[in-house]
């Protein structure tokens, strides 16, 4: 009986879901994220069986996984490449929402932004676990930014570190938090899907007619199957062709507590906010701007459906969105360079442009919602 109830729930939740007939491949990113997340959970579980933390950290366990465990290199590359694919497709998923005005579905949009924050936190914690030179010093720099919080900042940093400096106890905490946040992601994915299915999916035209819908299976499930083939190909390419492309070479060095790397940088999907952070002379101001760089997406959800649908069809919105995407790419590239001329100037200018275009987009959105 329980199996029949579970089967009918899954069937109604996924297969018989009413779906607009004009969805294109831009709407397949959510399914791709679900597949990659499942692969990340399985590969992460296998890696946790062989990952250990000793007095020198987790660097030796990574060498053990890569050299002594049968197929360990394969699982490790699946997990390390999967997070880059996951964040890249998540950014495309957000871009699709900006293009087609999906932010008018406020509950779904807000749950997605919260999910983005949790995924970024989990990705950062996982980046620290190899305990290489770049992982350690990057973690030290990022966590030390919390000391900019008035009154409680220093105590918060020492609590996270487990002492007056980052060490093995910090790594133990990060491993636990990485595991917990992965489970939280699963919960918020379910919340995101429930909210999406409650209000219904948007479509490229922005029209809402319940009669112009098909069940998700078999037409759209077949389309998602083709998307899954693309995901498998991307995994194959990243694992067997360029597994080290997105990994920093300095992270293959064991930690030297007496010497920092000449240029500390995070993973590529954090480079745009890292560039904004280092372009701000104030530590507290940099932390605030770094958070606001993503949190400002929340304000796009404040408005009416009609105004948002009409706004995203205008030429001005498309020009602003294209400019915003270009600035985002430039910030990502500049964040990977050292702080020297002309990269520092380009980073400062594009950081200002990033928020300027954001404010213009918000004002344009408020104007449309006021008129319509």
Curated annotation (Swiss-Prot):
Primary localization: mitochondrion
Places the protein is found: Mitochondrion inner membrane
Pfam families found in the cross-reference section: Cytochrom_B_C, Cytochrome_B
SUPFAM superfamilies per UniProt: a domain/subunit of cytochrome bc1 complex (Ubiquinol-cytochrome c reductase), Transmembrane di-heme cytochromes
Protein family: Belongs to the cytochrome b family.
Classification via Gene3D superfamilies: Cytochrome Bc1 Complex, Chain C
Biological role: Component of the ubiquinol-cytochrome c reductase complex (complex III or cytochrome b-c1 complex) that is part of the mitochondrial respiratory chain. The b-c1 complex mediates electron transfer from ubiquinol to cytochrome c. Contributes to the generation of a proton gradient across the mitochondrial membrane that is then used for ATP synthesis.
Note on how the cofactor is bound: Binds 2 heme b groups non-covalently.
Keywords, comma-separated and alphabetical: Electron transport, Heme, Iron, Membrane, Metal-binding, Mitochondrion, Mitochondrion inner membrane, Respiratory chain, Transmembrane, Transmembrane helix, Transport, Ubiquinone
Residue ranges of the TM segments: 29-49, 73-95, 108-128, 174-194, 220-240, 284-301, 311-336, 344-363
Assembly mode: The main subunits of complex b-c1 are: cytochrome b, cytochrome c1 and the Rieske protein.
Superkingdom of origin organism: Eukaryota
Binding site for heme b b566: 93, 192
Keyword Hydrolase: no
GO cellular component, one term: mitochondrial inner membrane
Example GO molecular function: ubiquinol-cytochrome-c reductase activity
Binding site for a ubiquinone: 197
Essential cofactor(s): heme b
GO biological process: mitochondrial electron transport, ubiquinol to cytochrome c
Protein name: Cytochrome b
Membrane topology, record value: Multi-pass membrane protein
Residues binding heme b b562, per UniProt: 79, 178
């Amino acid at each position: 009986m329980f199996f029949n109830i579970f089967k009918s729930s899954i069937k109604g939740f996924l297969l018989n879901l009413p779906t607009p007939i004009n969805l294109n491949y831009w709407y397949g990113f959510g399914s791709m994220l679900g597949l990659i997340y499942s692969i990340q959970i399985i590969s992460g579980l296998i890696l946790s069986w062989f990952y250990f933390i000793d007095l020198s950290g987790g660097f030796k366990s990574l060498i053990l996984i890569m050299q002594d465990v049968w197929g360990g290199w394969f699982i490790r590359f699946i997990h390390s490449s999967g997070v880059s694919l996951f964040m890249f497709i998540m950014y495309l998923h957000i871009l699709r929402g900006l293009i087609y005005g999906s932010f008018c579905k406020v509950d779904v949009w807000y749950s997605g932004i919260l999910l983005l924050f949790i995924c970024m936190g989990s990705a950062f914690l996982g980046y620290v676990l190899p305990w290489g030179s770049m992982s350690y010093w990057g973690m030290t720099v990022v966590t030390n930014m919390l000391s900019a919080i008035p009154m409680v900042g220093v105590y918060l940093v020492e609590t996270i570190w487990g002492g007056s400096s980052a060490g093995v106890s910090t790594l133990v905490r990060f491993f636990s938090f990485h595991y917990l946040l992965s489970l939280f992601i699963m919960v918020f994915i379910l919340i995101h899907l429930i909210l999406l299915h409650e209000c219904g999916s948007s479509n490229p035209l922005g029209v809402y007619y319940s009669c112009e819908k098909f069940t998700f299976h078999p037409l759209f499930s077949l389309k998602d199957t083709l998307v899954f083939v693309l995901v498998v190909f991307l995994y194959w390419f990243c694992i067997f062709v360029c597994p080290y492309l997105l990994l920093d070479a300095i992270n293959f060095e064991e930690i030297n507590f007496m010497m920092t790397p000449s240029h500390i940088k995070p993973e590529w999907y954090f480079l745009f906010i890292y560039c904004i952070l280092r372009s701000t002379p104030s530590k507290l101001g940099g932390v605030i701007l770094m958070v606001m760089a993503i949190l400002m997406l929340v304000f796009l959800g404040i408005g009416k459906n009609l105004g948002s649908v009409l706004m995203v069809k205008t030429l001005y919105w498309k020009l602003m969105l294209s400019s915003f995407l270009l600035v985002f790419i430039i910030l990502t590239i500049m964040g990977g360079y050292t702080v020297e001329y002309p990269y520092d100037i380009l980073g400062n200018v594009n950081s200002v442009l990033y928020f300027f275009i954001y404010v213009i987009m918000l004002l344009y959105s408020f104007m449309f919602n006021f008129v319509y």
